[in-house]
């Protein structure tokens, strides 16, 4: 019986902590309207699960804050868009997460929508010459 309890405890622990909020490599599409094409770049962002709960009875004293996997720290990297050299502004800065945590989503710096356009959205299908 103790062996079964251990395995149940172990798998619950693994499900909660091993799938937590971690740095993840993603590919995003970068576009500049003047250049009329997109390129894909690799960056790091936060992804994973955070323990959260939704209260049945809402209390005004205790706010109901849903936690999401979001960045704790990030830096901006800048690159020059290839094929856009004749343009005045061929530089593009993008965020790179360096640390993650479970916390409330900061709408000032993050798209907190449930269904956004996604990181691979591009308004230009192919390069125009």
Swiss-Prot record:
Residues bearing attached sugar chains per UniProt: 25, 42
Coiled coil: none
Residues in the signal sequence: 1-20
Entry's family note: Belongs to the glycoprotein hormones subunit beta family.
Cellular compartment(s): Secreted
GO CC annotation terms, alphabetical: cytoplasm; extracellular space; follicle-stimulating hormone complex
Single annotated GO MF: follicle-stimulating hormone activity
Gene3D superfamilies: Cystine-knot cytokines
Subunit structure: Heterodimer. The active follitropin is a heterodimer composed of an alpha chain/CGA shared with other hormones and a unique beta chain/FSHB shown here.
GO biological process, one term: regulation of signaling receptor activity
Task performed by this protein: Together with the alpha chain CGA constitutes follitropin, the follicle-stimulating hormone, and provides its biological specificity to the hormone heterodimer. Binds FSHR, a G protein-coupled receptor, on target cells to activate downstream signaling pathways. Follitropin is involved in follicle development and spermatogenesis in reproductive organs.
Keyword set includes Disulfide bond: yes
PANTHER family according to UniProt: FOLLITROPIN SUBUNIT BETA, GLYCOPROTEIN HORMONE BETA CHAIN
Intrachain disulfide bonds: 21-69, 35-84, 38-122, 46-100, 50-102, 105-112
Keywords: Disulfide bond, Glycoprotein, Hormone, Secreted, Signal
InterPro entries in the record: Cystine-knot_cytokine, Glyco_hormone_CN, Gonadotropin_bsu, Gonadotropin_bsu_CS
Name this protein carries in UniProt: Follitropin subunit beta
Entries under PROSITE patterns matching the protein: GLYCO_HORMONE_BETA_1, GLYCO_HORMONE_BETA_2
Keyword Cytoplasm applies: no
């Amino acid at each position: 019986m103790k062996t079964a309890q251990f395995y149940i405890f172990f798998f619950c622990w693994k499900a909660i902590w091993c799938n937590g909020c971690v740095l993840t490599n993603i590919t995003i599409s970068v576009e500049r309207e003047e250049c009329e094409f997109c390129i894909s770049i690799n960056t790091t962002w936060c992804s994973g699960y955070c323990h959260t709960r939704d209260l049945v009875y809402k209390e005004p004293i205790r706010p109901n804050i849903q936690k999401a996997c979001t960045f704790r720290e990030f830096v901006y990297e800048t690159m020059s868009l290839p094929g856009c050299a004749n343009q005045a502004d061929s530089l593009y800065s993008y965020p790179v997460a360096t640390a993650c945590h479970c916390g409330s989503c900061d709408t000032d710096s993050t798209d907190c929508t449930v269904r956004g356009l996604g990181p691979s959205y591009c308004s230009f299908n192919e390069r125009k010459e």
